[in-house]
Amino acid sequence: YKRQRNHYNELAVTLDQKAQERNIVIRFRLYDDGLGFRYEFPLQKNLNYFVIKEEHSQFAMTGDHTAFWIPGDYDTQEYDYTESKLSEIRGLMKGAITGNASQTSFSPTGVQTSLQMKTADGLYINLHEAALVDYSCMHLNLDDKNLVFESWLTPDAVGDKGYMQAPCKSPWRTVIVSDDCLLYTSPS
């Protein structure tokens, strides 16, 4: 069996909220073929139990890339993939949603991760998450005027996105970039 390489450079940025004496760490890891980041909530006096209401991670695209996507849906992933430009997602969404009794689409431009894209220059971009433990799964909502994706977490019945206890951390938000689409399926 072959071991996976896990070589990266790391930067941890601590943001302090002085009025409430709380902080959060945003941890970045840069790899040869992409990056990951996550939010960490250290053990601290003024933060114990808390509720995630929203997450606003954003991914700005450099162009109107070709995307391979399925509709963002809280209840099912049983869709065929649609291939389109990012700017075409809104117009194609209604046709991409097939008849199914358990569907909860959240936006006319919302897609599920993993989202694969191809640039005009032949680069492949993949947006996804990793180490999803005790946290809501991430979809992506596209601002199709500015070509910016924003994280969209699956809510519970009352709209909350997570019940947390410090110390804790979010899943990794991942961006893989490669000129080889097989990189995503390669075991090495």
Question: What residues fall within each predicted segment?
Answer:
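Phosphate-/polyanion-interacting regions in eukaryotic proteins
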Residues: 167-183
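Acidic, contiguous internal or C-terminal segments within carbohydrate-active enzymes
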Residues: 4-63
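Short alpha-helical segments and helix-capping/turn motifs at coil-helix boundaries
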Residues: 22-25, 42-44, 99-103, 109-113, ...
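Conserved small/polar residues in nucleotide/adenosyl-binding loops
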Residues: 1, 184-188
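Extended, low-hydrophobicity, Ser/Thr/Pro/Gly-biased non-transmembrane segments
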Residues: 17, 59-62, 73-142
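A general structural signal for short secondary-structure junctions and capping/turn motifs
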Residues: 3, 28-30, 49-51, 59, ...
